[in-house]
């Protein structure tokens, strides 16, 4: 289970390296620069064939969304939570003399087969809002037992999923 809730993204090279271990042969990401030049990063034929779950929410962004969407595109994971943020761009930060910075988007990245999620986000397979009673609680202090999104993911793993041909645990 990958808990990507509140994950703002990260290093594209790192995420594609991890996805290469998880996905079958095929595209991981299509990167398009400002001139329209496209680069495709692909996975080899070595894949991990186990049931996978991803937890996401409106604070899952950028490379976290690519990870979520790539697993979803290949039918390798069930996605539980709420719509992600919607950031399908790569940025560079230019430091300014007043100690502020300017973020400039310079590339778009598209998931393997889905449309770019820029401004839209990734829709989970199971839309599950975090219980209202937990909204004011520090996410890191919510136990697995009281986390209804986590409990839904565990329920799917225990009961099986047609998506990745998992039989009910005995």
Q: Where are these predicted regions, by residue range?
A:
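Structural recognition of the beta-strand scaffold that forms the well-ordered cores
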Residues: 1-3, 29-31, 51-56, 78-81, ...
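Terminal peptide-recognition signature
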Residues: 2, 52-55, 71, 114, ...
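Short, solvent-exposed amphipathic alpha-helical segments in soluble enzyme
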Residues: 2, 18-20, 68-74, 95-96
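C-terminal recognition in membrane/secretory proteostasis and scaffolding
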Residues: 3-8, 31, 129-170
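Gly/Ser/Thr-rich loop/hinge elements
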Residues: 8-62, 89-94, 110
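Extracytoplasmic/secreted proteins, especially bacterial periplasmic and envelope-associated proteins
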Residues: 13-17, 23, 62, 66, ...
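Short, well-structured beta-strand/strand-turn elements
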Residues: 74-87
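Conserved P-loop NTPase
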Residues: 91-94, 102-136
């Amino acid at each position: 289970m990958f808990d990507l809730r509140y994950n703002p993204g990260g290093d594209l090279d790192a995420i594609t390296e991890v996805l290469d271990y998880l996905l079958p042969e095929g595209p991981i990401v299509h990167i398009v620069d400002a001139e329209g030049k496209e680069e495709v990063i692909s996975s080899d034929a070595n894949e991990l064939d186990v049931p996978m779950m991803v937890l996401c929410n409106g604070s899952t962004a950028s490379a976290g969304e690519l990870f979520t969407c790539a697993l979803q595109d290949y039918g390798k994971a069930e996605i539980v939570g709420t719509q992600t943020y919607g950031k399908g761009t790569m940025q560079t930060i230019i430091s300014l003399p007043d100690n502020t910075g300017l973020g400039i988007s310079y590339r778009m990245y598209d998931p393997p087969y889905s449309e770019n999620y820029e401004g839209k986000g990734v829709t989970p397979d199971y839309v599950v809002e975090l219980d209202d009673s937990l909204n004011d609680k520090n996410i890191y202090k919510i136990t697995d037992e009281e986390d209804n999104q986590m409990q839904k993911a565990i329920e799917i793993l225990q009961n099986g999923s047609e998506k990745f041909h998992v039989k009910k645990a005995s």
